[in-house]
């Protein structure tokens, strides 16, 4: 059932691979519909965080309402929902897509289809969206729009003959894109009289309004004063304000089925208004929630410690503030003998981890040390209990472990065919299992591998880029767990275990990794007045050793000639002193040492 009002609404999002010009296209659409005056136009209007603008990526989903007047005089309300493009934020993308009826697939005319173009496109198809291909960057001399159209038809299988050819940078043919949205994206439907059902596709904390939920009303209507209930948490709130984004907040009287807007209800914490949850009325609630909700599950863990131990409380407050805005971030206190008090934090992926670290340093001015990232291992102990291990230091002794499993991801790598050998070589080095490969066209190949998450967690992406001169693109999703023969590698300095350097590695690689780490640390740790042995150990067995030689004073400088026994006495005395020093001396480990451990030798 569709009302007259709904016929003039279009809800759509823009999906693309990183850097194909998604946020710039959004800017042009905002400009072309006159949503903001020229003075207010700022590049990448929808990327609010400084970090987003700097890295040129979108991290949080955003929404904006555009009013488009056709030449025929009809007025359409277009709700644009801008989504993050990075694989770490896949769940957020899928929720944003669930709020739409259509998606603009932006493809770079010079690059063609890349791994995330496909991944995001399939996400859109899973949500039954109408896909409108738009080919961008046609002002570049290397653009090849006709070939790219053909590629879209062959690889994705959607009609692309009349895809608008635009340049988001110069604003060329933007009107064609707007017309395509109106003509191809279906109008929303949904009964305005039915009980309220609204999907939260983003939520964040505002210091004045509390938590602001971005919602898409699927059925019913919501207005100020309505008592609402969140279906997954069962909590009840009273609506304080509803409105739409122009990109700034503009309060309205009510939002009805088909509308996209925001609602505030003095909710204190983002965790209570999870992305993907369903809002309904407390008095007249819907029978079932909208499908597809799942809590955010962290995949990568890392320890974060303040360089200055006194800043522990500040770090805790900073993490709490970030968590208010980022439901996917989890943290719990932990202590390390080497680093003192800190937190074990869980992230969606590496980019997410990187961004959180950068925000801690930038927005909160904290100096932090981060330990090597690790994943969740599942361990079945000999007595039958199952534990999940996120920190290598807590690994039980080998005699207690019956079975150990590690997470496996399904990864798709799209690369120019010249580099297939290099990519396969890299994937095999990282314990990848080859699944299949298909040629997308004469020059590009898609390779599918199953790789342990542990192997791609740190620098797989960098290695892939350097082997393919930056041409390959990569996308992954977790598919499950598989048993593996893993051991814990410890590093001992001066015979003390440095817990923050411990890591879990496959048994057959332990020796090489231990040797490598010992050599790296030898280069990085500064010389002391006494000799420092660096040892790598698996259990009680030492598998590699390097020694940092002591600095020594020339005690014989003042002896000119003379008796050998006098010299011997001085040397013996020096030796004794060094021995004593070594018993009481402690070794300072510089921050670079923690970083060096992560860099694996290719």
Curated annotation (Swiss-Prot):
Short name of one Pfam family: GTP_EFTU
Record flagged with keyword Endoplasmic reticulum: no
GO BP of this protein: positive regulation of translation
GO molecular function, one term: GTPase activity
Membrane topology: Peripheral membrane protein
Subcellular compartments: Cell membrane
Known EC number: 3.6.5.n1
Coiled coil: none
Family statement drawn from the similarity comment of this UniProt entry: Belongs to the TRAFAC class translation factor GTPase superfamily. Classic translation factor GTPase family. LepA subfamily.
Functional summary from the UniProt entry: Required for accurate and efficient protein synthesis under certain stress conditions. May act as a fidelity factor of the translation reaction, by catalyzing a one-codon backward translocation of tRNAs on improperly translocated ribosomes. Back-translocation proceeds from a post-translocation (POST) complex to a pre-translocation (PRE) complex, thus giving elongation factor G a second chance to translocate the tRNAs correctly. Binds to ribosomes in a GTP-dependent manner.
Protein name as it appears in the record: Elongation factor 4
Species for this entry: Clostridium botulinum (strain Hall / ATCC 3502 / NCTC 13319 / Type A)
